From Swiss-Prot:
Protein name: OX-2 membrane glycoprotein
Transmembrane parts of this sequence: 237-257
A Pfam family assignment: ig
Glycosylation sites (chain numbering): 103, 110, 157, 181, 190
Species for this entry: Pongo abelii
Xref: InterPro entries: CD200_Ig_V_dom (IPR033321), Ig-like_dom (IPR007110), Ig-like_dom_sf (IPR036179), Ig-like_fold (IPR013783), Ig_sub (IPR003599), Ig_V-set (IPR013106), Immunoglobulin_dom (IPR013151), OX2G-like (IPR047164)
Subcellular location: Cell membrane
Residue stretches making up the Ig-like V-type domain: 31-141
Disulfide bonds: 51-121, 118-136, 160-214
Residue ranges, Cytoplasmic side: 258-269
Every Ig-like C2-type domain range: 142-232
Membrane topology per record: Single-pass type I membrane protein
């Protein structure tokens, strides 16, 4: 009598594990990767955002959308059949600078604060559906800096103001002794921020001929702004009052002498 013997592989668990690993590798390999890069550009200059489909998948249409609170907003599409199609709200504002179904670049002609945000590029591929990537655009404004000083009776006020986006930071390069500092921050409707720092120096005479150095930090870069304190602008209030009083007294004496002289002349026969 024959017996049917079924031999099970000794390493069946390892074989099954290997199958699962291979399936996972195939699945991961099949996943399409989209490479993007965030950009930071200056206000009122051109800007570009790029998207690249890394895997050799067949894309049929490329769509760019702007992310918004409710739902993404279509901006522009590109396909071989229809070419570039720009939505009315974005005409004369953007264009697709790189025409391709694997690599796509949109260009803003002149960015404004409204253009700041994140954008999605969607590759509509055959067999894998829509594969998307996200690139974000940040808008900045270079600092506009003013530096001036003013003498008063017993102290010197030096003011440094910087307006930029994002908000700048203002420092002073001065000795620590006898100096007080106050800072005011003001946000503007156009998205910029003004930071004003005022130095109160108690011994103004010692600052004559020296430089007032204001340091502005913006986007990781520190810039020095210098101004030499001119003694021609310095005066002492008590000294000024003394001079004015002396001049007034001399004028009164002159008037009195002139009046007496003419009075004596009138009395002579």
């Amino acid at each position: 009598m024959e017996r049917l013997v079924i031999r099970m592989p000794f390493c069946h668990l390892s074989t099954y594990s290997l199958v699962w690993v291979m399936a996972a590798v195939v699945l991961c390999t099949a996943q399409v990767q989209v490479v993007t890069q965030d950009e930071r550009e200056q206000l009122y200059t051109p800007a570009s955002l790029k998207c690249s489909l890394q895997n050799a998948q067949e894309a049929l249409i490329v769509t760019w959308q702007k992310k918004k609170a409710v739902s993404p907003e279509n901006m522009v599409t590109f396909s071989e059949n229809h070419g570039v199609v720009i939505q009315p709200a974005y005409k004369d504002k953007i264009n697709i600078a790189q025409l391709g179904l694997q690599n796509s670049t949109i260009t803003f002609w002149n960015i404004t604060l409204e253009d700041e945000g994140c954008y999605m590029c969607l590759f509509n591929t055959f067999g894998f559906g829509k594969i998307s990537g996200t690139a974000c655009l940040t808008v900045y404004v270079q600092p506009i800096v003013s530096l001036h000083y003013k003498f008063s009776e017993d102290h010197l006020n030096t003011t440094c103001s910087a307006t930029a986006r994002p908000a700048p930071m203002v420092f002073w390069k001065v000795p620590r002794s006898g100096i007080e500092n106050s800072t005011v921050t003001l946000s503007h409707p156009n998205g910029t921020t003004s930071v004003t720092s005022i130095l109160h120096i108690k011994d103004p005479k010692n600052q004559v001929g020296k430089e007032a150095i204001c340091q502005v930090l913006h986007l990781g870069t520190v810039t020095d702004f210098k101004q030499t304190v001119n003694k021609g602008y310095w005066f002492s209030v008590p000294l000024l009052l003394s001079i004015v009083s002396l001049v007034t007294l001399l004028v009164l004496i002159s008037i009195l002498l002139y009046w007496k002289r003419h009075r004596n002349q009138d009395r002579e026969p």
